[in-house]
Amino acid sequence: MAQQMSPGQHGSECIHDNAQSHLPPYVDCDSAGFRNNRSNLTLKFSSDFEKAQKAMEFCSDVCAVYFPADLDVVFNSEIENELAVDICEWRFFPCFSESLKRLAISMSRLSSLQIDLSYERRTLLHHHLVWIFLMDEVCERLPLLGLHDTMERKYLENLKNITMDLPIEDLNQYKGICPDDLLQVALDVQRILAEDLMPLKRALLEESHVQKCSETLCLFFDNQYEEGKIFFKRPTTHQIMSTRGYTIGTNMVFLLFLQTPMVDLYNADDPGLVQLSILVALFHDFIGLQKDLDSLKQDCDGSVGLNLVRVSMQESGHDEKEALQTVVRRLNSYCHGLEFFMSAYTPLCKQLYQEILKFVFALYDYHLLGATESSNSRYGWHRVSDYKA
């Protein structure tokens, strides 16, 4: 397990003028940024919308993300470390590949976000985050094997039935057709949902909350199937967008950390929540572009052709840097606009969106830093503290 790092290991940190601000130290820090192993582009964060937008006008090698100043994105290192220990003792942990084990440990950071949530609820959230990566691996590989309309359909139907406590079909009928390792992953995914996630939800959440979780998860499965149909069809941005707000999976994560009053307001088809999920998808595709391009060459993941940044490059004729800056400008404009419109919401609705937006930016942080503020090597980005504009 990664050990907690001391502040000195990151070099000099920026101190915010507002002592009450709980912005991550890389926000509004002129000397801090992130670079990818495969590019000289620098990613920076600013709580000043105009400054972020202008930074990209003056420098083609910078992407400046707007980070709203009133978001409390803080993580609890004690909880993070405890979750990291506990996930290693989870009975399903031995089922994971070495890379997924490392990912599971790093996700303890995301599950330690400073919010009003019991440790048991955090454990459920942590298990779900790990499970969704395992579940998605099956959906990414089956279309490459020509099994989308057969085994994948049955796999997703089984998962839906598990959420509704209905019988499932035995996937072993595909033994000899599907590689043994992938078949075992699919079986493990079903077991974790049936034996761990659903029992935890029923034990920790109110019945109406569990019902919303199941409905949202089934919507996710339905869109996963629809998305699999276009893996090899050179889809347009508009075709991808019709499912991506659901298949990015964040609506389910939102539900797992919300408290009852806000859960009552939650609607998986709420256009605003779908847009926030697209926000996550755009940043995910931004941060994962190089990884997806590598996977495309290796032909090991059918979903990489759906990367919205890559598709926008094909449609617009932009080079990589232009496409990345365009995506970031879109992210910034949406967030800035949302802040304005939220002022007209009811207090509870505003709180719902504020909490979800906080988690969106916690995801940004996780994608870049991973566990204990180190570096999330999954996407090839690393922190640089000596950047000069």
Swiss-Prot record:
Residue window of motif DDxx(x)D/E motif: 136-140
Residue numbers binding Mg(2+) 2: 136, 140
EC number, as in UniProt: 4.2.3.100
Membrane-traversing stretches: none
Motif NDxxSxxxD/E motif, residue range(s) on this chain: 284-292
Keyword list, A-Z: Lyase, Magnesium, Metal-binding
One MF annotation (Gene Ontology) recorded for this entry: metal ion binding
Amino-acid positions noted as binding Mg(2+) 3 in the UniProt annotation, renumbered to this chain: 284, 288, 292
Reaction catalysed by this enzyme: (2E,6E)-farnesyl diphosphate = bicyclogermacrene + diphosphate
Consequence when changing residue 292 to E: Strongly reduces the sesquiterpene synthase activity
Reported impact of residue 137 to D: Does not affect the sesquiterpene synthase activity
Superkingdom of the source species: Eukaryota
Keyword Metal-binding included in the entry's annotation: yes
Family the entry assigns: Belongs to the terpene synthase family.
Job description of the protein: Catalyzes the cyclization of trans,trans-farnesyl diphosphate (FPP) to the bicyclic sesquiterpene bicyclogermacrene.
Name of this chain's protein: (+)-bicyclogermacrene synthase TS4
Origin species: Penicillium expansum (Blue mold rot fungus)
Name of the gene this protein is made from: TS4
